[in-house]
Each structure stands twice: as structure tokens, then as C-alpha cells.
A protein has these predicted regions:
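Histidine-centered, metal-coordinating catalytic motifs and their short helical/loop contexts
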Residues: 326-361
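Polyanion-binding interface signature
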Residues: 224-336
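A broadly used, surface-exposed interaction patch
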Residues: 29-106
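Catalytic or ion-translocation cores adjacent to nucleophile or general acid/base/metal-coordination motifs
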Residues: 135-165
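Long, charge-rich alpha-helical interaction segments
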Residues: 158-257
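N-terminal extension/subdomain marker
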Residues: 1-61, 377-384
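Short Gly/Thr/Asp-enriched flexible loops that form oxyanion-binding sites at enzyme active sites
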Residues: 118-135
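Amphipathic, Lys/Arg-enriched alpha-helical patches that create a basic surface
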Residues: 363-385
Length: 385
């Protein structure tokens, strides 16, 4: 009669949390579970049935302590409203949120939506997402079950809808990757599907990105290129990973050098509103370009040498500003001027300095600087240090 009873026998459930209205068939729940414990009492059953019949649809609650006792130690019943208006929906949501106070780290949850309102399963998914992603309780959803009682077969099939919840996890991971470059959630999901090697590559990519390791980032980006073809031959990831990985790689499709990779990454940071990272990466791209242009090996000493050269050119430009403002600047002067102005903004960001301009002006300035630098780098201008 109740799928919950079959779930109990199959999975050996510790405790039940039942959710329903004052008009739900609580007397049948009592009958089913108390009979299994040989504690059924006819008078209790009749009294409960009468109370349910006499209670109006707007009744706040009825006494269901006998049902909780029949369900077993630790079990709890939550009585909700019909949800016919916003006030009742909010009331129901608050009831659901109380579950977050009871669930504990390590709990394994089996959800039965067979006898519920259609809206209850939606509530449950919202609450479980809240528990896992906001208050961060380590719980595991083992199954989301629906008993197809309308089937004409003598044996009624039970469908596990856990795949819906898993898809929500994939969507969450996709959002983290798309907006922040964080692949950790997706890496965990990929690993669960048995792809340990590519889970490691995903984590390495995000580690390099978040640490700002420009030297290894080009290699990490290249490691993503065949991810959608190799990693996921089946499974939910096939619906998510190709889209987000290809959207990210689109930024780098024309990048042939390390400096171009860094330049394009600065634009990706900007488009995803990580403005500090965008300035940092644009500056690093300009230094890398300077090393490439001078045919320097890209190491610390040569990068410092390149920075000093650009600062010296800008310093000379400023020293003779009254004369220079009437002539066309060389490519080296324009490039060095932008680099030094970016350095000032970056230092203000990094050291919480007193900015001479508003934040919005610095954000707008990035696009101007990016477009100018991009144009010069694409033309492969020659820098004269």
C-alpha cells in the first residue's frame, strides 16, 4: 500500500520524515506500520480517522504522535498546507527548511515522492540543494523513488529518479566552470564515472588558473581540447562538458603563442567580471610578448629585464612630455606607456591603494587597453628596447 514500507524493508531505513497535509491518509500510515510492529490498536485507528475527517482543510495541525511512534524512533511528521497561494507556499517552504536542522553529516537519504503533491518533489530538490551548497552538510542522496501504482501489472515498478538530481549537480558544476573557471565539481563527477586521469587534468587546470601560474596555463588549456571527445563516451556529462569546454576554448582558438594565450585569458577574466585577474593577466601577457619579441628565454630574469626596459621607455617619455605630446609615439612607446599605466591600476588593486579614479573607470579602461594591446600584438609590432 505504501512504497515507504517497501523502501524500509529493502534499504533498512533508520528513520522516516513524512510530509503531508492534515487531510493526508495518516490513519493508513498508522495501520501499515503499526501492524508490522504488532502494535496496531483499532481505537487509535478510528480516533485518528475521525479527527482527519472532522478537521477542515485549513486546519493547522492534528495530533499525529501515534503515527510517529508507529514509524519508529527518530521519525518525524511535518504537516504542510495545500500551497494554493504565496503565503501557503512560503509556509510550506519554511517547514521544508526545518529538515536542514535535523539532517546531519553522513546521512544517506532515500526520497519517496509516490503519494505526494507534484510540488513537494520540487520543494525537496530546492531544500537539498540548499543543504549541500549553502550550509554545506555532507549528505548523500541515494535514491529518488516513484512507485508506479497505476500500473495494471500485479508487480508495481519503482523508478529511481536520482538522475534528475545528478543532472542538477552537473549543471551546478557547469556554472562554476563557465563563470569562474572552477572545474572541481565537474572533476568530482567525472571521477565518479571512472575517469580519474581527466579529473586530475581538470583540477590541474583550475589550480593553475586560480594560482595565476601563467607558465603552465597554456599547457593546461591544451589538455582540455580533447576532453569532450575522450572523457565522456556516455553519461550525463556528455550533455554538459562539450558545451562549457568548447565555449571556454573558443577564446583561445586563434592563439599561437604564449602571449596570445595570456592576452585571450585576460579577456575571459574580464567577461566573467574577474577584473583584478584581467589586469594581472594582461600585464603578464605584455611582458611575455616583450620576451618573445626580443627572442629572450621566458624566465624570471628576462621578464624583469623586459619590465625595466618598458618602464625606462615610459620614464623617458614622461620626462620629455612637453615635446613628446606633439609627435607620434613609436610602437615601443605606446606599448610601454600602456604597460606602465596598467601597472599603476594593478598595484592599486593589489595593495588597496587610493585610486585616482573610480572603479567603474578602471573597468572601462581595461577594454580600451586590451583592444590597443591586442591590435599591436596581432600585428606583431617590433619593440625596440
Amino acid at each position: 500500500k505504501f512504497l515507504a514500507s517497501a523502501i524500509n524493508e529493502h534499504y533498512n531505513i533508520d528513520k522516516f520524515f513524512l510530509i503531508g497535509t492534515s487531510k493526508s491518509m495518516w490513519e493508513e500510515v498508522y495501520s501499515n506500520f503499526s501492524n508490522k510492529k504488532n502494535s496496531y490498536d483499532e481505537n487509535t485507528y478510528n480516533d485518528l480517522k475521525e479527527e482527519i475527517i472532522l478537521s477542515g482543510e485549513n486546519a493547522e495541525t492534528i495530533d499525529l504522535s501515534c503515527v510517529e511512534e508507529a514509524l519508529g524512533k527518530g521519525s518525524k511528521i511535518y504537516q504542510i498546507k495545500y500551497g494554493i497561494n504565496e503565503a501557503e507556499l512560503i509556509y510550506n517552504l519554511e517547514i521544508f527548511m526545518k529538515l536542514s536542522e535535523i539532517l546531519e553529516d553522513g546521512d544517506e537519504i532515500y526520497i519517496d515522492i509516490t503519494h505526494s503533491f507534484r510540488s513537494l518533489s520540487l520543494y525537496m530538490f530546492v531544500v537539498l540543494n540548499y543543504i549541500q551548497n549553502v550550509i554545506d552538510k555532507k549528505i548523500e542522496i541515494k535514491a529518488v523513488l516513484y512507485g508506479m501504482l497505476e500500473s495494471k501489472d500485479e508487480t508495481k515498478p519503482v523508478v529511481n529518479l536520482e538522475i534528475i538530481y545528478k543532472m542538477i549537480e552537473w549543471i551546478k558544476g557547469a556554472n562554476e566552470f563557465k563563470n569562474y573557471g572552477n572545474s572541481y565539481t565537474i572533476a568530482d563527477l567525472v571521477e565518479k564515472e571512472g575517469n580519474t586521469e581527466y579529473a586530475r587534468k581538470l583540477r590541474n587546470f583550475s589550480d593553475s588558473l586560480n594560482l595565476g601560474y601563467m607558465g603552465s596555463l597554456k599547457e593546461q588549456i591544451n589538455s582540455l581540447k580533447n576532453l569532450d571527445k575522450i572523457v565522456l563516451k556516455h553519461g550525463l556529462g556528455t550533455y554538459v562538458i562539450p558545451k562549457i569546454v568548447n565555449d571556454f576554448l573558443e577564446y583561445f582558438k586563434n592563439a599561437k603563442t604564449e602571449s596570445e594565450t595570456q592576452l585571450n585569458l585576460s579577456k575571459w577574466f574580464y567577461d566573467n567580471k574577474k577584473y583584478s585577474n584581467s589586469y594581472f593577466t594582461l600585464q603578464e601577457a605584455m611582458i611575455t610578448y616583450g620576451c618573445e619579441n626580443q627572442k629572450y628565454e621566458n624566465n624570471f630574469d628576462n621578464r624583469e629585464k623586459t619590465k625595466k626596459s618598458m618602464k625606462a621607455i615610459y620614464s623617458e617619455y614622461k620626462k620629455n612630455f612637453s615635446r613628446n605630446k606633439y609627435r607620434k609615439l613609436s610602437d615601443s612607446e605606446v606599448f610601454s606607456k600602456i604597460f606602465c599605466e596598467i601597472t599603476i591600476i594593478r598595484n592599486n588593486i593589489a595593495h588597496s591603494g587610493k585610486n585616482r579614479r573610480s572603479y567603474s573607470e578602471d573597468i572601462e579602461q581595461f577594454l580600451k587597453d586590451y583592444n590597443a594591446v591586442s591590435k599591436m600584438m596581432r600585428k606583431r609590432i617590433e619593440l625596440r628596447f
